[in-house]
């Protein structure tokens, strides 16, 4: 979408006057439309636009190498990376984008930027029963992001017809969360 159409999606919301945050997620990979995403976030944060703080905007990505680097250099908005599995071979099964720029490369790129002040780094992680919910996965996450100032958003998977994946129960989700929180 062009920047104007992106902004129109925001302006068209009935609750536009009540918005507190915007997340670029779920409508395709934002880095594949980077020029327009940057232009839209520029207008949202500029004095001549909405004059929002970049802290109110998050852009989610699977991690498209050169474009993620450019985004991090040209924007102060928060960034959320879709991880979903810390083990590259398994992540490639869930997310073909792993083959383009692996999660290990994404994390190495992120280490070059400061996320301790205004900008926040988050990782999105849909927890699938028997796929990415083991302590092996939790330990691999901790090892992968060690030293990074980041947050994890654990997302419960809701069953989709004809999709063989399942979500975890509350106990498993809490165990996984607690392990990440304690380490």
Question: Where do the language-model regions lie?
Answer:
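Conserved dinucleotide-binding and phosphotransfer motif residues
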Residues: 183
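Local cysteine-cluster metal-coordination motifs and their immediate loop/turn environment
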Residues: 1
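Conserved AdoMet/S-adenosylmethionine-binding subsite of the radical SAM
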Residues: 5-180
């Amino acid at each position: 979408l062009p920047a104007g159409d992106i902004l129109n999606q925001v302006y068209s919301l009935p609750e536009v006057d009540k918005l507190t945050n915007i997340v670029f997620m779920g409508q395709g990979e934002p880095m594949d439309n980077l020029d327009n995403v940057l232009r839209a976030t520029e207008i949202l944060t500029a004095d001549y636009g909405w004059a929002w703080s970049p802290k109110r905007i998050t852009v989610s990505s699977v991690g498209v190498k050169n474009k993620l680097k450019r985004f991090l250099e040209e924007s102060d908005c928060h960034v959320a990376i879709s991880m979903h599995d810390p083990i590259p071979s398994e992540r490639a099964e869930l997310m073909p984008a792993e083959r383009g720029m692996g999660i290990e490369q994404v994390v190495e790129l992120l280490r070059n930027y400061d996320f301790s002040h205004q900008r926040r780094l988050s990782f999105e992680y849909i927890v699938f029963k028997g796929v990415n919910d083991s302590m092996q996965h939790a330990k691999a996450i901790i090892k992968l992001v060690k030293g990074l100032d980041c947050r994890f958003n654990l997302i419960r998977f809701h069953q989709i017809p004809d999709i063989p994946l399942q979500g975890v129960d509350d106990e498993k989700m809490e165990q996984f969360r607690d392990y990440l929180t304690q380490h």
